[in-house]
């Protein structure tokens, strides 16, 4: 696979060429088996901590793809969650944003968007570490207590160019599949990364990396898959 193979075709992001027979390595087979089991989990997680060995494995998965995964300590997680809530509050004040959420989230869906079954409950204490896709609209979500000390990680890349963005996507895939293979649930938090103040999410100890994704990780109950378009509609 070659990223950005033709400077004259900026929308051509990658080319993939078929080669001869290939014997997959055990680690690759494990990740492949996790594809159908990987789902975003917006349910409350338990307070059980992800073991250091698994956290290191997730960080290594990002490194393989040229990215960096910072596991946040308690104070950093509190700071980043505050950024998430501030950004979401700002976004929900925008009628266009609320209209977009209404188009893509909630209700019964068979191929696009996020159905009610995948939205997760509301937090009893109004501090859920998940995005509110309903923008406060009433619905059949119910309420639940979320984990007291959410475990967060920030996926970053060294630069802000297009090749780095693509590598971030590859790294995110490998991190999520590795997490799934280890029984770890995950859900993304991107609100502050969608604002002009995305740089505030950076690790203050380094300060130069480009954050691309905030992940909430932990142990949770299994969730059903969300609908997808048929292959015939997305692949010629």
List the model feature ranges, each with a label.
Residues 1-236:
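Acidic, surface-exposed loops and disordered segments
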């Amino acid at each position: 696979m070659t990223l950005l193979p033709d400077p004259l075709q900026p929308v051509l992001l990658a080319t993939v060429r078929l080669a001869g027979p290939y014997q997959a390595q055990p680690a690759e087979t494990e990740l492949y088996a996790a594809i159908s089991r990987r789902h975003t989990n917006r349910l409350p997680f338990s307070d059980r901590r992800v073991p250091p060995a698994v956290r290191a494995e997730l960080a290594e998965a990002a490194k393989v793809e040229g990215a960096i995964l910072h596991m946040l300590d308690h104070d950093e997680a509190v700071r980043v969650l505050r950024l998430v809530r501030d950004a979401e509050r700002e976004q929900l004040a925008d009628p266009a944003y609320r209209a977009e959420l209404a188009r893509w989230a909630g209700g019964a869906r068979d191929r696009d968007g996020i159905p009610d079954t995948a939205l997760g409950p509301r937090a009893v204490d109004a501090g859920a570490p998940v995005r509110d896709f309903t923008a406060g609209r009433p619905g059949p979500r119910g309420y639940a207590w979320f984990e007291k000390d959410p475990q967060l990680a920030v996926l970053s890349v060294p630069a802000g160019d297009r090749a780095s963005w693509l590598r971030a996507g590859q790294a995110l895939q490998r991190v999520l599949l590795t997490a799934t293979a280890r029984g770890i649930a995950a859900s993304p938090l991107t609100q502050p990364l969608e604002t002009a103040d995305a740089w505030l999410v950076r690790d203050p100890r380094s300060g130069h990396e480009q954050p691309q994704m905030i992940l909430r990780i932990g142990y949770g109950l299994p969730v059903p898959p969300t609908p997808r378009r048929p292959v015939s509609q997305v692949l010629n």
